[in-house]
């Protein structure tokens, strides 16, 4: 990770770390790097989620883009994968999404996509960072007709919805689907999509006010949707995050179906249809041991990457694989989109339910999970967790006690000032004890003082 760019663009507290001034410079520098070879007036799409800071940052970013001669098309509020799809569909030179995904409302972020709809390479991000750190801005400053322009393309949302519908062979007539839109970017999109697919819909977390994004709702709070599914007697629930690139499902009896299980269900179905490229799925080190055991039983190969959907996508492109993702709900169907897409993943999952005639609880039960616990600890310097001797010592002690019947993963978050402690073991009691033992040392050594 660089000085500005993390694993998912530039993020920080809006108007404090991610300021309008920085957004303006990102517009100039990022726009220049991505469009300088295009010719006159390249086109760049700009979108945002529902955060109160979104319009402020959007205005500054667009000013920067226009100042280097770029034609900006505003999409308004739309999901990150919607932007990625429309970039390629509209023949744009690049696009920018203003969002901090599942982070709290105080945060915001800016991420770029190239003309192919994929996130930027490390080299491209490094070039933008070098320009940001240059003392004097020497980029072109056109005037008159050389300046860029701004127009609206709000109908892009409907084009994206129509595309999603074409990726499945079934409608959802007869299904009652509960939706939790995290008061974020899918709030209008999801209900429109599932209504078009003839489903009965109950929705929550679909009334954004600029301040309530991810607030007790969405994919990071699936327990809220679980209760809602039971209350509404729905067949399935789908919880998205703030920018719509993740989904966590809930089955008809209120059980959480995470990204591992969604990938497992879809991989099995695609394999049966002869559509799983190289009979392989790409996942990260966070996936449950039970996920890999289940894949082996199905004779499906797996490729494992570092945490972060960008690394999953890189491995998928390198190996020409078409399914991959993360336990957190970032799932990539590379035949259909270039990034994690909550809406796409949700309709693919329900399409499997309809095609097989099985309830989600039946499909999910085919993968047995190891007990797993994840603790997120807010720290002063997350990157020092890897070289802290006391943390290393307690990890080694726990791993020795496990004797191969479990695993430990302690790592810095790529998007927040957190250390994540993940433990899997043979029993829930062991998992809880090991996780708390390691977490206590991390807190003692590194945690911020409240």
Swiss-Prot record:
HAMAP family assigned to the protein according to its UniProt record, in alphabetical order: GlmM_B (MF_01554_B)
PANTHER family: PHOSPHOGLUCOMUTASE (ALPHA-D-GLUCOSE-1,6-BISPHOSPHATE-DEPENDENT) (PTHR42946:SF1), PHOSPHOHEXOSE MUTASE (PTHR42946)
This protein's name: Phosphoglucosamine mutase
Keyword Isomerase: yes
This enzyme's EC code(s): 5.4.2.10
Entry cofactors: Mg(2+)
Family: Belongs to the phosphohexose mutase family.
Pfam families, per database record: PGM_PMM_I, PGM_PMM_II, PGM_PMM_III, PGM_PMM_IV
Catalyzed reactions: alpha-D-glucosamine 1-phosphate = D-glucosamine 6-phosphate
Gene3D superfamilies the UniProt entry points to: Alpha-D-Glucose-1,6-Bisphosphate, subunit A, domain 3, Alpha-D-phosphohexomutase, C-terminal domain
Top EC category: isomerase
GO cellular component: cytosol
């Amino acid at each position: 990770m660089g000085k500005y760019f993390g694993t998912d663009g530039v993020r920080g507290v809006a108007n404090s770390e991610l300021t309008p001034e920085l957004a303006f410079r990102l517009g100039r520098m990022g726009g220049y790097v991505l469009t300088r070879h295009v010719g006159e007036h390249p086109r760049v799409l700009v979108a945002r989620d529902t955060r109160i800071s979104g319009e402020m940052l959007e205005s500054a970013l667009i000013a920067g883009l226009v100042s280097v001669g770029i034609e900006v098309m505003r999409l308004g509020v739309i999901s990150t994968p919607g932007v990625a799809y429309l970039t390629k569909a509209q023949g744009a030179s690049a696009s920018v999404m203003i969002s901090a995904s599942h982070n709290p409302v105080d945060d915001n972020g800016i991420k770029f996509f190239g003309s192919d709809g994929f996130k930027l390479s490390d080299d491209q991000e490094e070039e933008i960072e070098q320009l940001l750190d240059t003392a004097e801005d020497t980029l072109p400053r056109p005037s008159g007709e050389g300046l860029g322009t701004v127009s609206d393309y709000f109908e892009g949302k409907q084009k994206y919805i129509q595309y999603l519908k074409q990726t499945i062979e079934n409608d959802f007539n007869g299904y009652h689907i509960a939706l939790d839109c995290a008061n974020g970017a899918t709030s209008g999109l999801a209900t429109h999509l599932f209504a078009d697919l003839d489903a009965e819909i109950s929705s929550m977390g679909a009334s954004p006010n600029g301040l309530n994004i991810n607030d007790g709702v969405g994919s990071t709070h699936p327990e809220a949707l679980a209760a809602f599914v039971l209350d509404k007697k729905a067949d399935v629930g789908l919880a998205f995050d703030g920018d719509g690139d993740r989904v966590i499902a809930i089955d008809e009896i209120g059980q959480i179906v995470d990204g591992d299980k969604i990938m497992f269900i879809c991989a099995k179905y695609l394999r049966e249809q002869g559509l799983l490229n190289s009979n392989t799925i790409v996942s990260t080190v966070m996936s449950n041991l039970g996920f890999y055991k289940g894949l082996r039983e199905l004779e499906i190969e797996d490729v494992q990457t570092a945490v972060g959907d960008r690394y999953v996508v890189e491995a998928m492109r390198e190996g020409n694989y078409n399914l991959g993702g993360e336990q957190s709900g970032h799932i990539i169907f590379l035949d259909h989109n270039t990034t994690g897409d909550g809406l796409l993943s949700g309709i693919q999952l329900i399409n499997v339910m309809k095609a097989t005639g099985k309830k989600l609880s039946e499909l999910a039960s085919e993968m047995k999970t190891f007990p797993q616990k994840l603790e997120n600890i807010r720290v002063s310097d997350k990157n020092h967790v890897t070289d802290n001797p006391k943390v290393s010592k307690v990890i080694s002690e726990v791993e020795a006690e496990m004797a191969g019947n479990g695993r430990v993963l302690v790592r810095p978050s790529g998007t927040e000032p957190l250390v994540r402690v993940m433990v899997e073991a043979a029993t829930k009691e062991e998992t809880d004890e090991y996780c708390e033992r390691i977490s206590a040392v991390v807190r003692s050594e590194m945690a911020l003082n409240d």
